[in-house]
């Protein structure tokens, strides 16, 4: 396989698939002409322009976010809610970084998806040193860290007994004589001055400190209210690989306890907590998943292997079809587009997950896809492929959309049609009462969740609902001439739908980028 071909397979395809579902960008501007019978659809387009498109346009215009380079991480940073790691693991985090470069981190673990019943807490101490700007992830900073100690404290007798058995089985002879562990007593899992270590019993790794990004923003354009967010490196989706994995994306951000969203109740609870008083978040009922309406990204999203994108998904619950628009960029603030993907297909009825509390399982199929190169480099790469591997041979031009369904996808992007993926979703509401939609995190090894056993057990960054219902795809396609990224975009509304499906299938190919 040629070097150019490998580059295509490793860069373009992963970027497309890793990103998720999403409908149009604010950059899609429907043509002012209307169909004779399109009064209702014209009203819909006007609403969409003022909602979904406006929200994405806000992101593409910078969203009043500034990135600190190099980042200042001194301070107290806390989770904004109950987080889900692969496994699944339900947790909250409380990290303190001091001016002498030392840190103390709490990782609170729970037995349910609402973080209401703490099971055990890890207390991690160490030292961190910021290095240079990351050459892997633009906008990030690389760091080195050194652990001084890791302790665990159990919050119930049952968990103490269970965890001590697990440690003894994982590291024979590790436990001192005297019986199992007891509740509310801190035990060492690792000490700097000794070789006595058994952190693998709890799948512990702190490599998230190897990649750091700090963002500052003023919500609602209020200069009186600063919110600071700390993004730390992502965690491998296979718990056994965590200690070997170097981050290439981010976890959900922590907020600065001093400069946080004032509506964040969880922030205040976690801020006041410690290993003897773990945070107990307010109980909430799980929302029933209804895949309908339109959903867009809330920020410029980062995927492993240097992929930046925004997503726009459209779900039609009347016939269980979906559309996704994926807008890919070369920069971490999503200002310089590289290519877009529009995908559509069908999805199954949801079934409550027996493995991930609060999750609902779906099966997604994609059978139609369009691609639009948005810069000369991407168009050139696509033109390298010959025959029926990715659209019409040698015909790719910047800003011109092509349907790749007839070539069964696009080899250059690692996409083969038709394709099936096994997904998991959950729905929540934010502090403003808006609905958020989370879909499954892509496997860190770049594979595709194309079998039930490969279904995700954790989630990507959420999309926010921007419209509660949507017209049928056929109506959009026949009556819209949207332009992505201004004049340089595709000619049909189909280009808006593409990113949603791409988001589902891009992650496997992201791995190829590595």
From Swiss-Prot:
SMART domains: APCDDC. The keyword Ribosomal protein does not apply. Induction: APCDD1 is transcriptionally regulated by the CTNNB1/TF7L2 complex. GO terms for molecular function: identical protein binding; Wnt-protein binding. GO terms for biological process: astrocyte cell migration; hair follicle development; negative regulation of Wnt signaling pathway; regulation of odontogenesis of dentin-containing tooth; Wnt signaling pathway. Its main location: membrane. Residues 1-26 form the signal peptide. N-Glycosylated. Residues 27-492 are extracellular. Belongs to the APCDD1 family. Negative regulator of the Wnt signaling pathway. Inhibits Wnt signaling in a cell-autonomous manner and functions upstream of beta-catenin. May act via its interaction with Wnt and LRP proteins. Homodimer. Interacts with LRP5 and WNT3A. This is Protein APCDD1. It comes from Mus musculus.
